[in-house]
């Protein structure tokens, strides 16, 4: 059993009431670094009064694996469920190939999450291990919550929950499309007098002269290099 139990997420004053992570095996336990609670003990305005305060000088939390033999694998990916809300604390992963003495090749887990934003509770992360880490006979992986970044006079906050950590062989070909968006004039927007909202109807003549923008970020998570990648958009 755990205290608190697996039905409780963050207990911090500014993140309390958040549900726990919705990973496949959350009912048998998960890891949480509750930066909010550790700083204020669940009391609004109680900055620096918690059991492991982040204010006034910051705090750090780490979770490190035992040694893992990856000598037979040239391309490896780290996959896990992550529920993360950010104020100034940053979720990171680092790797060691010298028995856990030093950790390098640091990777930010959620670089797309801004201040006061959060992932979904069932978010799944996939990170490709650096080439100099895959293939090594002794690898330690460290999950690292960095609450030493100062923002708006405060350190840390809010929380990071992880569960169902596993290593897989990186698929040869795997694309992920993110940050998809459409709408808005990208040509002649200063003279059309139209906001280009995605619910707007326009005559074809105007649409041809002032086309919509369709864009996204395509990430290659596969082991193979990909060339001449083209993003297609379909309007129905």
Feature locations, PLM:
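Surface-exposed, low-complexity/disordered Ser/Thr/Gly/Pro/Asn-rich loops and linkers
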Residues: 2-72, 159-161
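Extracellular acidic, Ser/Thr/Pro-rich low-complexity tracts
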Residues: 23, 84-86, 218-224
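Extracellular carbohydrate recognition and processing domains
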Residues: 102-135
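Extracellular/luminal regions of secreted and cell-surface proteins that mediate adhesion/ECM remodeling
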Residues: 158-236
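Extracellular beta-strand-rich recognition modules
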Residues: 63-65, 70-85, 91, 95, ...
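Extracellular and analogous surface-interaction loops
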Residues: 63-76, 128-133, 201-208
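Extracellular carbohydrate recognition
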Residues: 55-62, 147-170
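Short acidic/proline- and small/hydrophobic-mixed sequence motifs that coincide with surface turns
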Residues: 88, 103, 224-228
């Amino acid at each position: 059993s755990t205290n608190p139990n697996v039905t409780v997420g963050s207990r911090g004053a500014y993140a309390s009431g958040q549900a726990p992570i919705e990973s496949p095996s959350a009912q048998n336990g998960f890891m949480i670094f509750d930066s909010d609670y550790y700083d204020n003990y669940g009391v609004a305005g109680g900055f620096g009064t918690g059991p492991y305060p982040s204010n006034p000088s910051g705090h750090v939390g780490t979770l490190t694996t035992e040694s893992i033999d990856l000598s037979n694998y040239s391309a490896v990916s780290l996959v896990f469920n992550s529920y993360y809300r950010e104020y100034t604390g940053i979720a990171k992963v680092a790797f060691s190939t010298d028995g856990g003495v030093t950790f390098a090749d640091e990777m930010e887990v959620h670089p797309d999450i801004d201040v006061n934003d959060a992932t979904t509770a069932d978010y799944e992360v996939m990170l490709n291990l650096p080439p100099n880490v895959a293939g090594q006979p002794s690898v330690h992986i460290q999950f690292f919550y960095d609450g030493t970044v100062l923002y708006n006079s405060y350190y840390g906050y809010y929380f990071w929950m992880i569960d169902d950590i596993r290593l897989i062989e990186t698929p040869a070909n795997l694309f992920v499309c993110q940050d998809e968006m459409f709408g808005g004039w990208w040509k002649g927007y200063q003279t059309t007098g139209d906001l280009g909202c995605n619910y707007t109807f326009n005559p074809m003549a105007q649409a041809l002269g002032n086309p919509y923008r369709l864009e996204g970020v395509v990430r290659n998570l596969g082991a193979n290099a990909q060339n001449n990648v083209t993003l297609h958009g379909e309007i129905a």
